Amino acid sequence: MRKIIHIDMDCYFAAVEMRDFPELRGKPIAVGGRSDRRGVISTCSYEARKFGVRSAMSSYHALQLCPQLILVPGRMEVYKSVSLQIREIFHRYTDLVEPLSLDEAYLDVTDCDAHQGSATLIAKTIRDEIFEVTGLTASAGIAPIKFLAKIASDLNKPNGQYVITPNQIADFVKDLPLSKIPGVGKVTSKKLADIGLTTCYDVQQYPKVQLIEAFGKFGHVLAERAQGIDSRQISPHRVRKSVGVETTLAKDIFTLEQCHQVLPQLIQELSTRVRRSAKDRQIHKQVVKLKFNDFKQTTIEHRSDEISINLFHELLLQALQRSQGRGIRLVGVSVGLADVTLASSESSVDQITQLDLQF
């Protein structure tokens, strides 16, 4: 088994703002767009979270929950710069670093000799160095596998860490709610609960064949996670699986004609991003996303090996038919990407060892 650390910065964007503007410290703040421009919260301070403010919430709703909330515009270039400082610290201990976003990453420290190979002490040292260099706190999860390390990093926040050793895995996952497993969202949780599955122990007792019948490939993944199995390796150079662009509209729109007016600029920007960041990848599907004024969303996708304007218009029509009279506040378009060899092969078909590791 490996020694995996998941580092997660504490309310990262908000923490950077409070560091740079001390007058914000101790106050409920959120980084996000203005409520009169239909902004959305990126992240918020712990003081704001006490009022129920959360990421991805509309700024308008956040201000209803917390009238004294201070909205701060994001400074993405600053966040990127600080993130690079943090990654430099990671690479002092291992080259096996898999960034998930600006504020979190997996590290494989199995072969790191620091602190006699203790992943627990390595994680603590990394967190201390992050604070020394950036003035920001980070939390960490330490485990032999990725998904448990990620779960563990959330168990002693803020500015803490949690360790799951190899011999603790079985007991830990037994009572673990399925909703804690990365990839199990509200919709999947409800589907699982409808068939009596709420914990990993429930899944352990459930026939794997039926799980796969109900959830497809994810059923197989879920069965493994419920047993404490995750064979994924750290990927220092993560392969991009999709490229997309979306826009939040100044006012709700309701008609197909209004939606069509939004598409050209989105498709142009998407094409630019694909050329810039996915030169060696092959398009294998197109996706349209609509978010309605009740914040529920829908996506429609179809196989395609190129960006087709006509197909985007067809997918938009199908997505709009799900609106049920609701206004549309966001429109997005994206493409799925695959290796050139994988994409070409798809198109030809119809459309617990080493338990003595120091933790």
Curated annotation (Swiss-Prot):
Cofactor comment: Binds 2 magnesium ions per subunit.
Active site residues per record: E104
Molecular functions per Gene Ontology: damaged DNA binding; DNA-directed DNA polymerase activity; magnesium ion binding
Keyword Metal-binding (UniProt): yes
Protein location: Cytoplasm
One Pfam assignment: IMS
Binding site for Mg(2+): D8, D103
Record domain UmuC: where: 4-185
Family annotation (PROSITE patterns): UMUC (PS50173)
Residues with site note (Substrate discrimination): F13
Keywords: Cytoplasm, DNA damage, DNA repair, DNA replication, DNA-binding, DNA-directed DNA polymerase, Magnesium, Metal-binding, Mutator protein, Nucleotidyltransferase, Transferase
A GO CC annotation given for this chain: cytosol
GO biological process: DNA-templated DNA replication; error-prone translesion synthesis; SOS response
EC number(s) given by UniProt: 2.7.7.7
InterPro entries in UniProt: DNA/RNA_pol_sf (IPR043502), DNA_pol_Y-fam_lit_finger_sf (IPR036775), DNA_pol_Y-fam_little_finger (IPR017961), DNA_polymerase-Y (IPR050116), DNApol_IV (IPR022880), IMS_HHH_1 (IPR053848), Rev_trsase/Diguanyl_cyclase (IPR043128), UmuC (IPR001126)
Cofactor(s) for this UniProt protein: Mg(2+)
Catalytic activity: DNA(n) + a 2'-deoxyribonucleoside 5'-triphosphate = DNA(n+1) + diphosphate
Function: Poorly processive, error-prone DNA polymerase involved in untargeted mutagenesis. Copies undamaged DNA at stalled replication forks, which arise in vivo from mismatched or misaligned primer ends. These misaligned primers can be extended by PolIV. Exhibits no 3'-5' exonuclease (proofreading) activity. May be involved in translesional synthesis, in conjunction with the beta clamp from PolIII.
NCBIfam families given in the database record: PRK02406.1
Family membership: Belongs to the DNA polymerase type-Y family.
Quaternary organization: Monomer.
Name this polypeptide is given: DNA polymerase IV
Source organism of the structure: Shewanella frigidimarina (strain NCIMB 400)
Designated gene of the protein: dinB
